[in-house]
UniProtKB/Swiss-Prot annotation:
Transmembrane segments: none annotated. Coiled coil: none annotated. Expressed at low levels in roots, rosette leaves, cauline leaves, stems and flowers. Keywords: Chromosome, DNA-binding, Nucleus, RNA-binding, Telomere. GO terms for molecular function: RNA binding; single-stranded telomeric DNA binding. This is Protection of telomeres protein 1b. It is found in: Nucleus; Chromosome, Telomere. One of its GO terms (biological process) is telomere capping. The gene is POT1B. Belongs to the telombin family.
Amino acid sequence: MEEERRDDYKFLRIQDAFKALHLHVNLIGVIVELGFSNGSDCSCTLKIVDPWYSGSGLPVKFVARTIRDLPRVESIGDIILLSRVKIVLINRKITALCNETTSSSFALFNGKHSVDSIPYQSSPKFLMREQDKNFLSNLREWMITYKFEDGSCCFTSLKDIKEGECSNLSCQIVHISKVYKDRWYLFVWDGTEMPPCNILVKSERLPLCVEPEMLPTYMLRKFPTFGSVLRIIVDRVSEKQAIHCLQPGQHVKLLNLFFQVNMGLWNATFTPSTKMQYTMSREMEAFSPQRMCGEKFSPRWNPIARCISRSHSEITGVAHDDAPFVSLMDILTYHNVTAKFRCVVRFIQVYPRDVRKLRDINGNIKLVAILEDATARIHASLYADEGEKFFGCDESDEEALVKKLNRLLGGEEMEKVPRNPPWVQCCLFSFYKHKMDQWESRRFRIFDTWINAS
């Protein structure tokens, strides 16, 4: 009798679940959207679809005694089996409620690239049946040709983001870094350049990156060398538990990210409504740098010229007009310690700012600049004869020096007055200070560059 009752057990199609308000049902579906757990009440949400309902998905809310008991989805596109979940209305939306404190249970299985019928996570009350394996197999086969379409979501490129607003982002995970025990950073990229920021800081030295320290060269070599890499700050417990399913190289859709600017650098944070959404394999393939920008080679300078198309002002001139433009990320990740480069950058800050302090005790110009493009920031020095060439005016003519610096920096450094430094061309060479530790002591210096007369 027990066997007969179990054989009659069936999953409800998701399209029929929308008509089963207040009933307890059994469901199986593909996870197409993942929300973050609410640390205060131990709950989280996701959306599922099946072959008979592939719209935006059925919301499923999980409630547990502890965060540890909530589903820990390894990848968007995995399969979930739900037993005795109740169809309810939450915020006027039909939702399947899986409450651990009642008779509900769930099990998580790997998605279309697996043949395993053993769940990688299941709740204590879950009981696997032999016929469930057929449902798993059929869903995985269906996913091979499945195309998820959620017409309610519009995605914004990084080039179009706005400070203080929330947007949806379709991007590639470049790197995931744990900086402190309480903070992680997601590094994401979509092949476009984030808008340059106005500079508001007057006296405080600007950082080179959002994270506390720049990543080492061997890690940066895994980054794309064109387009901007956005840092997403992750510091809430619930957020950190959700991002464990992300891996470098994955293409992911993030809904409702909050974008902000600090010290002239873009970053983003999760909001209570941030979710991760399913991405098709063909969409992931489109995020290949080689497909987006072909490599060009220069026999004379560095064989790394990319599709650098940033136009520059005529404020500066260089002695090497035939050299290809490269990005600052190209420079940071170049395979030789010493080399020469030509780039288009913004001078966002210089030290010392007071022209009366530009010279050292020997009378040589000595200046450190923070240079920026869409890919990175670096420190670059200007020294001695190259400094004389750069400014091209008498050392006693302080007014001319101030005027040239202001043109380069996009205005005077005044409290609460934003500057918008212009894009200028610049030649750099890299060198090392310590022969026994060349990469760690690698530095950059400006050369064969000058500020044109206004």
